[in-house]
Amino acid sequence: MFITYQQTSEQSYLLDYGEDINFNTNKKVISHFKYLLKKNYKYILNVVPSFNKLLIVFDIEFKKDIENLIKKLKSIKDYDEIDSIQHLISICYDEEYALDYKNVENAFSMDFDEFINFHSSTIFNVFMIGFMPGLPFLGLLSVNKSLPRLENPRISIPAGSVGVVDNLSVIYPNQSSGGWNLIGKTSFNLFNKNTNKPTLNPGDSVKFKSISKKEFIENEE
């Protein structure tokens, strides 16, 4: 259940599930997110989950209904019908794409081959999709050391680049700027143009499969 909520505009409420960013907190967010999607209330225009918050955008004519619904949500601890998919995503960790592997080695006190085994054996939770269409925030790596963002973000990062900051990973769906430490590249399509929806969804899981540079180039062709 969420801890607090507040009205953030005439047509939106923000539910706050606490400060911690972890699987259990996010599971509560996703539980309510999936519940609202399943119920398909006519007065809810959009629902946006994040690590530990849930934004509900509603039709202003139904403010009383949304207030009653939020009170109801507070009593729902877990919604069991959470459909999730585990995605196996091929990634090439070759140094040509892992431009910041030295940062990873220094921050986590392990050589990059060891990190590759560590990263590719982790089952990541899709915490949220945001900032650009299809961009997934994945966690959590079992590390207790800090790997900060780059001091000088890159102006241009190729689509498919995989980045790491602390215990989180992202996959850049499009060419863009960014400050995450790049560790590899994938040809996985993060956005379905036919359905106009992201391929990954909050609550899904991801496991990376390490492939050679030759295999990666063949996959791109």
Which sequence ranges carry the predicted segments?
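Glycine-rich active-site loops that engage anionic ligands at enzyme catalytic sites
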Residues: 1-221
